[in-house]
């Protein structure tokens, strides 16, 4: 018996249409998504062409566009910074096994699907002698869809102690060691594992 393909093609086209329209975003959310996508395109341009990119260091890694989850506004949170009264200097490991000293500065909190989570904010010193602040984390996607060592979020300190920060996991990124073995990067501690699949931000490169 001969089966017509027309109904199947029609259903396939409908499913593609529904897939592209699966979420109803507000105009503000759509503007945010466009901003994230623009940022990602600019980062690809940097990674491909800039001399400081890991893809141009010793020419050992071939560039290809970075992989991401689709931007998802539900992975954007607000939190103040809760500074630790005693800011301990602790030792962490780099991916090549070397010890590094870092200050456990404070933490941020967020709620997802009615569950509370916490991530530490660390203070370090760059090679140029500049202070920097960062969040390093692993989650349920680590070693699967995302880089096994973990991912990072930059953190810009505001002098106002009551300032409300935006914690945007759509901006979570891989450290350079995810692309090239020439680099060593900080390994997130077990304390900074969140029992949640953070399906936002950058995916595994390899």
For each feature predicted by the language model, list its residue ranges.
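Post-signal-peptide N-terminal segment of Sec-exported extracytoplasmic proteins
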Residues: 40-73
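Acidic, glycine-rich flexible loop segments
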Residues: 136-173
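C-terminal motif of bacterial Sec signal peptides marking the signal peptidase cleavage site
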Residues: 17-20
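Mid-length scaffold segments of soluble, non-membrane domains
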Residues: 85-149
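Bacterial N-terminal signal peptides that target proteins for export
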Residues: 1-9
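Extended, aromatic/histidine-rich regions of cofactor-dependent oxidoreductases associated
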Residues: 172-206
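Bacterial signal peptide processing site
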Residues: 22-24
């Amino acid at each position: 018996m001969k089966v017509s393909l027309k109904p199947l093609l029609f259903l396939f086209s409908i499913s593609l249409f529904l897939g592209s329209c699966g979420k109803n975003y507000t105009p503000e959310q759509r503007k945010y998504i466009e901003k994230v996508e623009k940022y990602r395109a600019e980062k690809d341009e940097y990674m491909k062409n800039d001399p400081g990119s890991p893809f141009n260091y010793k020419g050992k890694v071939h560039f290809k566009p970075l992989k991401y989850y689709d931007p998802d506004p539900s992975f954007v949170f607000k939190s103040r910074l809760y500074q630790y009264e005693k800011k301990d200097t602790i030792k962490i490991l780099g991916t090549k096994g070397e010890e590094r000293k870092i200050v456990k500065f404070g933490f941020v909190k967020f709620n997802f699907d009615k569950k509370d989570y916490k991530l530490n904010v660390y203070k370090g010193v760059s090679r140029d002698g500049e202070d920097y602040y960062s969040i390093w984390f692993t989650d349920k996607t680590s070693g699967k869809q995302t880089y096994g060592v973990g991912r990072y979020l930059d953190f810009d300190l505001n002098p106002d102690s009551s300032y409300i920060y935006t914690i945007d996991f759509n901006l979570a990124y891989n450290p350079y060691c995810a692309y090239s073995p020439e680099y060593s990067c900080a390994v997130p501690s077990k304390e900074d594992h969140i029992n949640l699949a953070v399906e936002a931000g950058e995916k595994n490169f390899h």
